[in-house]
Amino acid sequence: DDAELGQHGDGYTKQLAYYELDLGLNHVSRRWATSTLRSACCLAAIPGGADGPSGVLVGGEDYIEYLHEGMSPPSSSSSSSGTKNSKRLICAIPRRELHPKSKGVLITTISVLRQKKGKFFALAQSELGDVYKVTLQMSKEDKTVVTHMTICLLDTLPIGN
């Protein structure tokens, strides 16, 4: 659905731009940009290099999306483009049974926590106070390629800022 993936009738597309800081040159450069979900409202950086695959978690209404430099834009076909992360990962947020279907669940906060070198997970909180654990599963052959994303409900806490 083009409307859900950032395409509005007025030609507006919500974009995510990824910038990189080069400490040696004291210079910031734009690495890549892509369109994202229309309801996207919060971001969390994923560790890169030896610590993980790098990229960004984007929280929005009813979904959390993982974006990386090598991923294809949402409007392109689902065929592989030859990049190592050509498939976009979008995972639906678990919903309460009594929550109205007409109202979405908005993710308001995402925080990435590191356990050990190469091991991490993210905690996300909804506007209702539900806390979710977000886990990215990497390929066994190449630890810089994310193959799956899972979200599970942990608890309900007072809303954090």
Give, region by region, the residue ranges found by the protein language model:
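Large eukaryotic, non-enzymatic subunits of multiprotein complexes that serve as scaffolds/tethers
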Residues: D1-N161
